[in-house]
Amino acid sequence: MAPYIIWDWNGTLLDDVDAAVYALNRLLSERGLPTVTRDFYRAHFGFPARNFYIELGMDPDRDWERICVDFHRHIAEAPQAIRPDAVEALELARAHGLGQSILSALRQDLLLRDTGRDRLHGYFDEIYGVDNLDGASKLARGRQLVAQLRSRGLLPEGRALYFIGDTLHDAEVATEFGATPLLVDHGHQTAERLAATGCRVAESLPAAVRMVI
């Protein structure tokens, strides 16, 4: 049976790094803190996002809910689009009989809105986001997604499972729920950081799919 792919959304299929840097710098400016460059962001960002904000001088213990709400308000002001090679990769996977779902740390309603806006729902068996704006771990939802795929008969015993993402957290999550991690180097963390995991790193989404086929 052809393998199964679970895709990350933000930074992987969705090109939102510049939007995230814009939103982050709005947060920092509003709090009188120094802004950061895109390169700094990709070299330091990680999950849980709360720890990254502490590194930048914010105080999540005091106003974490406000930080999360403000970040998502600001990121909505910035242009975001699926990556130019995203549909090519999804079509390539479909043509080779690969199953596909999404797992994201984005809140479920926002994830469904964004994937619907880009008319991508038809590619995926399941689209799993989280129930908050925290930018924390998606591991629990990943386990639920795998259980759902198994209950639907889409992930029978022996079918190879891959998780394609763009962060160290994606590699950790994949390993925890039994998938092989594949990382792409265009997202929220640098290629150097990703390579240090020992995972395979692709230069494009179609290249990642070809590693699975």
Set out the residue ranges of the language-model regions.
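Active-site neighborhood of HAD-like aspartate-dependent phosphohydrolases
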Residues: M1-A43, E55-G57
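Conserved Lys-Pro-Asp/Glu-containing loop-to-beta segment of HAD-superfamily phosphomonoesterases
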Residues: Y4, K138-A171
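Helix-loop "lid/cap" segments that line or gate small-molecule binding pockets
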Residues: L27, F47-D61, D114, L145-A147
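Conserved H-loop
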Residues: P34, D59, H121-D125, L155, ...
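A short, structured active-site edge motif that brings together acidic residues
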Residues: D39-Y41, H121-A136, A160
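Short, acidic loop-to-helix structural element flanking the phosphoryl-transfer center
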Residues: A76-I102, Q108-L112
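Structural recognition of alpha->loop->beta junctions
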Residues: R119-Y128, R193-V212
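Acidic, Mg2+-coordinating phosphoryl-transfer loop and its flanking beta/alpha structural elements
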Residues: F163-A202
